[in-house]
């Protein structure tokens, strides 16, 4: 999405049929990086439904199943006769081969997992500008044993004779690897070839057009009614606030609930930024003592989360009744939430069809049904990176657009064990030093998250010739693309030394700083 369309009635140029792959969402993101609008739909979508949608191309995702298994997920076989170009990825390729008369079996030799050099047999069409010998990411235990009539080999690897195949006259293509993952060095070239040259798509999924359409749709939906938004200061709710302000002006009211677990200076910054600098109506709700009193004596992290979430709902309900009435509730629901709620009925462990599980998403924590709000969700077809682009176009500063992720329960889950005012003040000061030093070093935007954690133990130290017995602070810095996996960040020794020295000298109650060098997996980014 560049700065030059939106959900609304826009039809997807590319439809991704999801067979339970962990990469289905990533395929959609990669297609959108070419400025072509894509949607993820269930593998069970019928050929008639696709005909009505009239996409210019269809991509079949990978998946955990085997196409020859009794309960394997199968697409409508009439899809092959729609005259729409199809690209099958991994399981999607095997399904195409199987349904059109070929044969797929369990690999008799080595299964392929990881990187493999691609040897190209036909460098035209799908593989134009894909370098011979380029690395592609493999993840399959089954292999094609016989191609259907009309198909030809485009490329192979050492262990996979048919790594890429095509039926040119019917515009049917398959690849045994995953071009969408970052490890596939020329994967985007292949995706662009399919999207632009084979499907004939135009790059019209742009930020400017999205904003114009979203503003029009919000105005049409809301009319002259009032809208309430729970503002957290994160990029999603901030972008939504700017978009709604542009669309409906003073009909928007934002509610900022300060539960006492935010970072140092954050509540003041957010109120100054939204209310005073940009004249967005923000109601500040100081609920600090109410929240912390509810956590008295609570040490279990899940119980802490539950208490904070429940109390948030109660405060939100009370204050919305006081400030209302409101007809609409604005939520920063994103496309990954929509995909997860829709659910693909594939068991990720067995690869078999199972009953669909529906999961609801509420950015304000699961609102009571009797609030009777109608929902406004203009961001529900955007991925996180697209939200950031929209935010920039609307005038959000980089300090919010590129703000590090921050958990909903805030510092309450970065204090292990019971949360007290003393611990909160200690952690706020330490966390501020971490962020200040990383910004000063020019590394803030190079790191996915950087923060401090306070442990519920004390250690012995010596300061000013006197014995100390104080808390340790854990420094947690990770690098990641999407938060699903992460590696610990290798910070310069000089930076680590400055952070440690400042914390033990400036933060009362701390005498030791330790570094967390655990990746995700096996660890998680947050400690609780």
Curated annotation (Swiss-Prot):
Residues 205-403 form the GMPS ATP-PPase domain. Pathway: Purine metabolism; GMP biosynthesis; GMP from XMP (L-Gln route): step 1/1. GO terms for molecular function: ATP binding; GMP synthase activity. It comes from the Bacteria. The keyword Ligase applies. Residues 13-204 form the Glutamine amidotransferase type-1 domain. Keywords: ATP-binding, Glutamine amidotransferase, GMP biosynthesis, Ligase, Nucleotide-binding, Purine biosynthesis. InterPro entries: Class_I_gatase-like, GATASE, GMP_synth_C, GMP_synth_GATase, GMP_synthase, GMPS_ATP_PPase_dom, NAD/GMP_synthase, Rossmann-like_a/b/a_fold. The keyword Phosphoprotein does not apply. ATP binds at residues 232-238. The active site is at residues 90, 178, 180. It catalyses: XMP + L-glutamine + ATP + H2O = GMP + L-glutamate + AMP + diphosphate + 2 H(+). It holds the Pfam family NAD_synthase. Homodimer. Catalyzes the synthesis of GMP from XMP. This is GMP synthase [glutamine-hydrolyzing]. It comes from Prochlorococcus marinus (strain MIT 9303).
């Amino acid at each position: 999405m560049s700065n030059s369309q939106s959900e609304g009635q826009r039809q997807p140029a590319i439809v991704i049929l999801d067979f339970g792959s962990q990469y289905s969402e990533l395929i959609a993101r990669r297609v959108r990086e070419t400025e072509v609008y894509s949607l993820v739909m269930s593998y069970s979508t019928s050929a008639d439904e696709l005909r009505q949608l009239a996409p210019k191309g269809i991509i079949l995702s990978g998946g955990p199943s085997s196409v020859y298994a009794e309960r394997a997920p199968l697409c409508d076989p009439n899809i092959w006769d729609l005259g729409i170009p199809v690209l099958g990825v991994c399981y999607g390729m095997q399904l195409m081969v199987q349904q059109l008369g070929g044969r797929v079996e369990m690999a008799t030799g080595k299964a392929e997992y990881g990187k493999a050099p691609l040897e190209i047999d036909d460098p035209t069409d799908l593989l134009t500008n894909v370098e011979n010998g380029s690395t592609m990411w493999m993840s399959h235990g089954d292999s094609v044993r016989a191609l259907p009539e009309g198909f030809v080999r485009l490329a192979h690897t050492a262990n996979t004779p048919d790594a890429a195949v095509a039926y040119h006259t019917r515009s049917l293509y398959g690849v045994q690897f995953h071009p969408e993952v970052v490890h596939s060095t020329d994967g985007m070239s292949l995706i662009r070839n399919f999207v632009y040259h084979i499907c004939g798509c135009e790059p019209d999924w742009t930020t400017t057009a999205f904003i114009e359409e979203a503003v029009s749709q919000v105005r049409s939906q809301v009319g002259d009614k009032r809208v309430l938004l729970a503002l957290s200061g994160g990029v999603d709710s901030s972008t939504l606030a700017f978009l709604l302000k542009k669309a409906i002006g003073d009909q928007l009211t934002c509610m900022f609930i300060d539960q006492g677990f935010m970072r140092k200076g954050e509540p003041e910054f957010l109120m100054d930024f939204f209310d005073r600098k940009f004249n967005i109506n923000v109601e500040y709700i100081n609920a600090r003592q109410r929240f912390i009193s509810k956590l008295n004596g609570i040490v279990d992290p899940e119980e802490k989360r539950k208490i904070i979430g429940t109390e948030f709902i109660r405060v939100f309900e009370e204050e919305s009744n006081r400030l209302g009435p409101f007809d609409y509730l604005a939520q920063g629901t994103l496309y990954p939430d929509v995909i997860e709620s829709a659910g693909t009925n594939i068991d990720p462990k067995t690869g078999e069809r199972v009953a669909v599980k529906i999961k609801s998403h509420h950015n304000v924590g699961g609102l009571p049904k009797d609030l009777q709000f109608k929902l406004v969700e203009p961001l529900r077809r955007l991925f996180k990176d697209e939200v950031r682009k929209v935010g920039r176009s609307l005038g959000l500063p980089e300090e919010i657009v590129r703000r590090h992720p921050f958990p909903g329960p805030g510092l309450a889950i970065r204090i292990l064990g019971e949360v007290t005012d003393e611990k909160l003040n200690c952690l706020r000061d330490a966390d501020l030093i971490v962020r200040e030093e990383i910004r000063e070093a020019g590394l803030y935007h190079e790191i996915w998250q950087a923060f401090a954690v306070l442990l519920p133990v004390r250690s012995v130290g010596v300061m000013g010739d006197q014995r100390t017995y104080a808390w340790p602070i854990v420094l947690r810095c990770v690098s990641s693309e999407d938060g699903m996996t992460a590696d610990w960040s290798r910070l310069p020794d000089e930076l680590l030394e400055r952070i440690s020295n400042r914390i033990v000298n400036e933060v009362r109650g701390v005498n030791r700083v330790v570094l967390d060098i655990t990746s995700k997996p096996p660890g998680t980014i947050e400690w609780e």
